């Protein structure tokens, strides 16, 4: 069993899927910590990513899964890749993101080993071309995470212990990540934060958050954000005890 499973949900990405994956594998070649495998859950209807993985499996240990279920739903694809991962630590990485620190996996393992945490976030930056980066960010737990105020980052900034993994709620699209973070904190407490910048989020028009439907805005003293009101209504029912309890987490009591 590998120490780390790098979990990558994939799809065609309008013809750029293999290019983005190749960038990830370039970063994995350079990692100082090499006790890992790669798990891919592929929503593609064609076999381009399958063929790429078959070829590169000569160099890397890869578990490839063709996932025909719920195509187009990121949460379902992430769940599939986590469900089939065998590593002690699961490192999530979205297909269009990439490593920018050759010690990323080493630092993630160290984060778990030295803190005894169950899950963690790490710093991230942004890129448009996969080379130059800008706007470095250190994750921060803020108020109203459940409602979509996200200063933590995307799932690409997350690593969790396999034995404590939870699955994403496939009823959600826009708030699927922050609702997942909320449940993880309820169950396992605050995540450990690694301030180092380990990955870059690729900015482009096809990014998931760029193609979502919004119909409402939540106001906050430090800024507002767009949401889907139906998802907010759903969360108010699903997590009614949290709202009744003045939005307090167990580790705050």
Give residue spans per PLM region.
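Flexible acidic/His/Gly-enriched loops in nucleotide-sugar-dependent glycosyltransferase catalytic domains
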Residues: 68-79, 104-166, 205, 210-233, ...
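Short, acidic, metal-binding catalytic loop of nucleotide-sugar glycosyltransferases
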Residues: 23-35
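Short beta-strand/loop segment that forms part of the nucleotide-sugar
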Residues: 35-45, 65-67
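Catalytic beta-strand/loop signature of glycosyltransferases that borders the donor
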Residues: 123, 178, 192-198, 203
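Active-site nucleotide-sugar/metal-binding loop of Leloir-type enzymes
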Residues: 79-89
